[in-house]
Amino acid sequence: MISNCGYLAFFLRAIPHSFFIFATRRKQLNLTDKKIAIIGLGYVGLPLAVEFGKKYTTLGFDISQNRIDELLKGKDSTLEVEPADLKLADKLSFSTNLEDIKKCTVYIITVPTPIDKNKRPDLTPLEKSSESISKVLK
């Protein structure tokens, strides 16, 4: 169990009937004084990080340094987000350094969960990202 994790959310992609798992210690979630971490900056994570980053302090985390470098230059090679929207997200920062997520209080994991021919999800990316996060939150 992650003891100092205030909020934790997982978005499981590529699973039929998208699953959303959310655990919270409070009934209402006021994000004004929170720092949000979006883990995984693909087609789900980046647009989410940009929208949160327009209003709330948000850290976009990805394991790919190339991905972070392009986003820091205001470019998105996947074309999920327009350069103008990236500029509007003035409370959004990017990093590949796991230590940077220590200061976050809300964690949203948006990593791939591809399905096999039997429509079973491969949860390996989710498991690995969760393990990585747990190391810095101890």
Segments predicted by a language model, with ranges:
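Ala/Thr-enriched low-complexity intrinsically disordered regions
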Residues: 9, 14, 23-24
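Structural/interface elements that position substrates and couple domains in central-metabolism enzymes
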Residues: 21, 25-138
